[in-house]
A protein has these predicted regions:
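Alpha-helical scaffold segments
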Residues: 2-276
Length: 276
């Protein structure tokens, strides 16, 4: 066969197999064609984003998209890939480590992202809290997941163990209050936060005075186990707890001994006499 004939044959083959990205729409592609399309170096951002709107993509197709370096030049593409419900953790989490703060928040809040991936993405975000600005901390406290809000309750800006100045106190108070107002924050997360050794007096006082959280019985019981609750609040919260249960609770409490003793005296004095 001559060189000319070979060249003509190759041209015919190319005509028979044009790039799928040029001849089809993402939703029209048959499952058998998806893998070849995902690997196509000519894959455009718009086509790839439209492709990721398909819920029927296989893990193999998603992994192939993750290997398509041309497609992954796009920030939108990376976010869409990490947010797809079929994207495996070993693909989405490394991608998430490349994201900006609010891109991480967006992925973690996406309803399509699997729960275990959301947790992993939240952990990436939490690991960066020391490096974000005050404005970003406030925004995260208001809008991020409950896990991030709970982390912000504990992640106060300090030097050593002492808050540096009045401005820092005011900033961190705003962050704490914003986190406590976060609609995704749960009772369990608040309890876990106040019981952590890292919980500050400011956090305990903020929760103890909060109009929503301070009314919860389980949170009151948790606050009675902390070392920072004021005597006035401790007396108020202990009044609704039966004496035997209060004894048990205070056994594991870090409250100062003098406050524990007064709570027990008040509880015994208000208890009805035996046999009544």
């Amino acid at each position: 066969m001559s060189d000319r004939e070979m060249s003509e044959d190759e041209g015919l083959e190319e005509e028979k197999a044009p790039s799928l990205t040029a001849s089809a729409t993402p939703l029209a592609l048959a499952p058998a064609d998806l893998l070849r399309t995902a690997a196509d170096p000519a894959l455009t951002e718009d086509f790839a984003l439209a492709l990721l709107k398909r819920a029927d993509l296989s893990v193999e197709v998603i992994e192939q998209l993750a290997k398509n370096t041309n497609a992954l030049k796009s920030r939108k593409m990376k976010i869409a890939l990490a947010s797809h419900p079929k994207t495996p953790r070993h693909v989405s989490v490394p991608l998430a480590r490349q994201f900006y703060t609010f891109d991480l928040m967006k992925v973690a809040l996406s309803p399509t992202v699997p729960a275990d991936v959301k947790v992993a993405v939240d952990h990436v975000l939490i690991s960066r809290l020391k490096t974000v600005t005050v404005g970003e901390r406030l925004m995260l406290a208001r809008r991020a997941s409950g896990r991030v809000a709970a982390a912000l309750l504990l992640d106060v800006e300090t030097i050593g163990t002492k808050i540096t100045d009045a401005k820092t106190v005011a900033r961190e108070t705003r962050v704490t209050q914003a986190a406590l107002e976060n609609r995704r924050l749960t009772e369990a997360l608040v309890i876990n936060s106040v019981l952590r050794p890292a919980a500050t007096a400011a956090l305990v006082h903020a929760v103890a005075q909060h109009p929503k959280w301070s009314c919860r019985r389980e949170i009151r019981a948790a606050l009675l186990r902390t070392e920072h609750l004021s005597l006035a609040r401790a007396l108020e919260f202990s009044h609704e707890i039966p004496t035997p249960l209060l004894h048990e609770l205070l056994t594991n409490s870090r409250l100062p001994p003098q406050i524990k003793d007064q709570l027990l005296r008040e509880s015994q004095a208000s208890s009805p006499p035996a046999g009544c």
